[in-house]
């Protein structure tokens, strides 16, 4: 796959297991706003989609209440949640190898950009990325728009860019942005190749090491 110049990674469920921090962000927001409990499946469904969509769907919030709950979520994320994450086994080594092979590396995440930057710095991998693009407080960006920002910063076009991600949101974002998609099944979204194959893709990786083999 030497045609690629820029490899863009999703964060949650692709680069790192961020579930503990995300779940604790939700619990903090629930406590602060006295929200009812939700099921484990509903909790897990918060990983991947835009934050406001998850709170709208699972807690039926809107307007000022929605803004308040997102504020509490972000409050926990920036003070504690960003430290409650761990890189998937082999990912740090993969990023180092890809960088040495001359790829430009980027992150496109619906997580708040400040949180993502601080988290990846804490995990000691921020230095591998040319750009980290995430959600902004005053601007709602779709996955495809974030991918466009990454490509623009890295000076690459659609034909030379690839997104690695673990969910249908990633696959649809790549399709909308006009770039290739590599699905992974070790994260929170896809669980097998059949699910990945429901979307246009150039491959499916069950482990981090398989990403490296596919890109070699």
Predicted regions and their residues:
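A short, structured active-site edge motif that brings together acidic residues
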Residues: 126-141
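Conserved Lys-Pro-Asp/Glu-containing loop-to-beta segment of HAD-superfamily phosphomonoesterases
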Residues: 6, 143-171
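Acidic, Mg2+-coordinating phosphoryl-transfer loop and its flanking beta/alpha structural elements
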Residues: 163-203
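Substrate-recognition element of Asp-dependent hydrolases with the DxDx(T/V) motif
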Residues: 26, 94-120, 135
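N-terminal helical cap/lid subdomain that shapes the substrate entry/recognition surface
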Residues: 2-93, 101, 114
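Conserved H-loop
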Residues: 36, 125-130, 157
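Surface-exposed amphipathic alpha-helices with a cationic face
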Residues: 92-99, 171-175
């Amino acid at each position: 796959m030497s045609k690629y110049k820029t490899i863009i990674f999703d964060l949650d469920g692709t680069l790192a297991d961020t579930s503990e921090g995300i779940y604790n962000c939700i619990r903090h927001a629930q406590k602060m706003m006295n929200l009812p409990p939700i099921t484990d499946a509903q909790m897990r469904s918060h990983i991947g989609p835009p934050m406001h969509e998850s709170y709208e769907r699972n807690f039926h919030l809107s307007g000022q209440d929605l803004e308040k709950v997102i504020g509490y979520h972000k409050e926990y994320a920036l003070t504690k949640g960003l430290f409650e994450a761990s890189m998937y086994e082999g990912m740090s080594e993969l990023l180092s190898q890809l960088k040495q092979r001359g790829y430009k590396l980027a992150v496109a995440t619906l997580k708040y950009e400040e949180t993502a930057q601080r988290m990846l710095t804490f995990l000691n991998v921020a230095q591998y990325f040319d750009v980290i693009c995430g959600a902004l407080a005053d601007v709602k960006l779709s996955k495809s728009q974030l991918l466009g920002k990454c490509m623009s910063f890295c000076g690459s076009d659609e034909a030379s860019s690839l997104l690695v991600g673990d969910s249908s949101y990633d696959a649809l974002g790549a399709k909308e942005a006009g770039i290739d998609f590599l699905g992974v099944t070790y994260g929170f979204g896809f669980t097998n190749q059949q699910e990945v194959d429901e979307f246009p893709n150039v491959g499916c990786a069950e482990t981090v090491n398989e990403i490296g083999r596919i890109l070699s």
